[in-house]
């Protein structure tokens, strides 16, 4: 396995990471937990160090299933791996039954609650990389970045990133608290990217 350092952060990750969304969200029924636990152990043995999840990767009955799965399966390897998870989307449970739509929520109080939930579910005392999953048009980037600076100072988050944001948003947030990663969806088979 090859490894990379993300930007100037010093955060070293495997060149290939394991995105975990499909294990319990979006692509049919959740995968078998025992099989996924074995897969995680195999991935670590192969040199994978970067594992990506989000607080909203789950099912209607267990909306945080993916983080719980990672927390259980990767606990024995915690000192060897980098865990990335995401905040900024919440389930709109105003209807009585799911599937529940996701709505952006990056208010500081929501971020603080989200980080505590992710830490508990992932069975860790810190998050290596914490992404803003989607931009909340009701919250200024400086307010989000200020909250991240606070969480970094507390040691709960080591690095942070932003997913699917425009240049102006990234620049404004970065001025307040330096961003390690800008997460963009690219597909290897596409030859042209905007």
Regions found by a protein language model. Give the residues of each.
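N-terminal binding-site loop/beta-alpha segment at the start of enzyme catalytic domains
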Residues: 1-82
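Active-site beta-loop-alpha junctions enriched in small/polar residues
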Residues: 21, 56, 86-90, 132-135, ...
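Short, acidic/polar
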Residues: 31-43, 107-120, 168-170
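Distinct, well-ordered alpha-helical segments
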Residues: 63-74, 96, 123, 138-149, ...
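Surface-exposed, active-site-proximal loop segments in enzymatic domains
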Residues: 91-105
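Conserved small/polar residues in nucleotide/adenosyl-binding loops
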Residues: 184-193
């Amino acid at each position: 396995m090859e490894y990379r350092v993300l930007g100037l952060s010093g955060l070293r990750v495997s060149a290939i990471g394991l995105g975990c969304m499909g294990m319990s969200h979006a692509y049919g029924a959740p995968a078998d937990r025992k099989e996924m636990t074995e897969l995680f152990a195999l991935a670590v043995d192969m040199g994978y160090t970067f594992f990506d999840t989000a607080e909203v990767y789950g099912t209607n009955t267990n909306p945080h299933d993916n983080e719980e799965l990672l927390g259980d399966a990767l606990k024995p390897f915690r000192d060897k791996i980098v865990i990335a998870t995401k905040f900024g989307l919440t389930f709109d449970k105003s209807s009585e039954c799911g599937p529940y739509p996701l709505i952006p929520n990056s208010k500081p109080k929501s971020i603080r609650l989200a980080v505590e939930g992710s830490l508990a579910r992932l069975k860790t005392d810190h998050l290596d990389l914490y992404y803003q999953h989607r931009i909340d048009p009701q919250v200024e980037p400086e307010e989000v970045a200020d909250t991240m600076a606070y969480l970094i100072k507390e040691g709960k988050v080591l690095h942070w990133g932003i997913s699917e944001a425009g240049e102006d948003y990234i620049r404004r947030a970065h001025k307040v608290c330096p961003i390690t990663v800008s997460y963009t969806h690219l597909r290897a088979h596409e030859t042209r990217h905007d």
